[in-house]
């Protein structure tokens, strides 16, 4: 036994070479190469550090709580503290905006810069998911960079829309919606109206028999909201059909779908969620994106 044991642990690389661990399988032996000493000390240090972390910081979950650590620190309290510090920094600039009438902010370069900076942050946090980071919009969400406004693009009108929303449940919010004509008009009539509507913006010829029939149906059913010339009515939120700017799409299939099923997009009322000063900054920011009236 002694001879066998010694033979299994004999150096395989000659004198001074690594020995085997004593195991062999199908002629394969495992060399006994110890880990470098620096690696072992590093490993031991990480174990000691881990124990220290468990003691100092929140680490272990309990039944209804967790170990808080001797330092009493946690990331949530740190975030609350950072938010509080940020609010203190913003308080001075917010106070300046709060004490100036909305229509005077853009006349003062310093206030305009403050409003745009605060409005940009608020827009990114609250508005960008729907309207896009740069306000370019998407299908069903208005582009805020152009001059096509359903409910008006003046400072006062934008502030009203942001504060009270559209079909948001707020009593002071905008309430207009596009009716569904699928049960009122025949498919042929809806197709003719779609041809006429597209002709208003030059997307289709207006002298075809279908467009001419559509014009008559439009006058009887659509002109009340969109106007006889199709230029819309901002008091009702009725779209201008002559500018070629489409919220849901200007191809015939989409227009037929809109006429058939109607539209009723919703925008939240931000008045209960944001401070008046933040809404004022948002109003200025949106107004200066490029399409403000």
Curated annotation (Swiss-Prot):
GO terms for molecular function: electron transfer activity; heme binding; iron ion binding; oxidoreductase activity. It holds the Pfam family Cytochrome_CBB3. It is a single-pass membrane protein. The chain crosses the membrane at residues 43-63. It comes from the Bacteria. Binds 2 heme C groups per subunit. Keywords: Cell inner membrane, Cell membrane, Electron transport, Heme, Hydrogen ion transport, Ion transport, Iron, Membrane, Metal-binding, Oxidoreductase, Repeat, Respiratory chain, Transmembrane, Transmembrane helix, Transport. Residues 114-201, 209-290 form the Cytochrome c domain. Residues 1-25 are annotated as: Disordered. GO terms for biological process: oxidative phosphorylation; proton transmembrane transport. Residues 1-11 have a biased composition (Basic and acidic residues). Heme c 1 binds at residues 127, 130-131, 267. It is found in: Cell inner membrane. Heme c 2 binds at residues 178, 222, 225-226. Signal peptide: none annotated. Pathway: Energy metabolism; oxidative phosphorylation. GO terms for cellular component: plasma membrane. Its main location: membrane. Its cofactor is heme c. PROSITE patterns: CYTC. The keyword Metal-binding applies. Component of the cbb3-type cytochrome c oxidase at least composed of FixN, FixO, FixQ and FixP. NCBIfam families: ccoP (TIGR00782). PANTHER family: CBB3-TYPE CYTOCHROME C OXIDASE SUBUNIT FIXP (PTHR33751:SF1). C-type cytochrome. Part of the cbb3-type cytochrome c oxidase complex. FixP subunit is required for transferring electrons from donor cytochrome c via its heme groups to FixO subunit. From there, electrons are shuttled to the catalytic binuclear center of FixN subunit where oxygen reduction takes place. The complex also functions as a proton pump. This is Cbb3-type cytochrome c oxidase subunit FixP. It comes from Azorhizobium caulinodans (strain ATCC 43989 / DSM 5975 / JCM 20966 / LMG 6465 / NBRC 14845 / NCIMB 13405 / ORS 571).
């Amino acid at each position: 036994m002694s001879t066998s044991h010694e033979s299994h642990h004999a150096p395989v690389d000659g004198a001074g070479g690594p020995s085997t661990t004593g195991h062999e399988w199908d002629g394969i032996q495992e060399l006994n190469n110890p880990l470098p000493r620096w690696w072992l000390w590093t490993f031991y240090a990480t174990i000691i550090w881990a124990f220290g972390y468990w003691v100092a910081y929140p680490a272990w979950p309990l039944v209804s709580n967790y170990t808080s650590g001797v330092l009493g620190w946690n990331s949530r309290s740190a975030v609350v503290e950072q938010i509080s510090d940020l609010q203190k920094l913003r308080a001075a600039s917010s106070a300046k905006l709060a004490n100036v009438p909305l229509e005077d902010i853009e006349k003062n370069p310093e206030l305009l810069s403050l409003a745009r900076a605060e409005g940009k942050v608020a827009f990114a946090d609250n508005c960008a998911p729907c309207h896009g980071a740069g306000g370019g919009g998407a299908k069903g969400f208005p582009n805020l960079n152009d001059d096509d406004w359903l409910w008006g693009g003046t400072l006062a009108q934008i502030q009203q829309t942001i504060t009270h929303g559209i079909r948001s449940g707020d009593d002071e919010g905008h309430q207009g919606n596009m009716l569904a004509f699928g049960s009122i008009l025949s498919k042929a009539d809806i197709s003719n109206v779609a041809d006429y509507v597209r002709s208003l913006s030059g997307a289709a010829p207006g002298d075809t028999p279908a467009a001419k029939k559509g014009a008559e149906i439009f006058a009887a059913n659509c002109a009340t909201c969109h106007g006889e010339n199709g230029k819309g009515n901002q008091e009702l939120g009725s779209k201008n059909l002559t500018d070629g700017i489409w919220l849901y799409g200007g191809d015939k299939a989409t227009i037929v779908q809109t006429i058939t099923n109607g539209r009723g997009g919703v925008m939240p009322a931000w008045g209960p969620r944001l401070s008046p000063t933040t809404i004022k900054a948002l109003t200025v920011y949106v107004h200066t994106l490029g399409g403000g009236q």
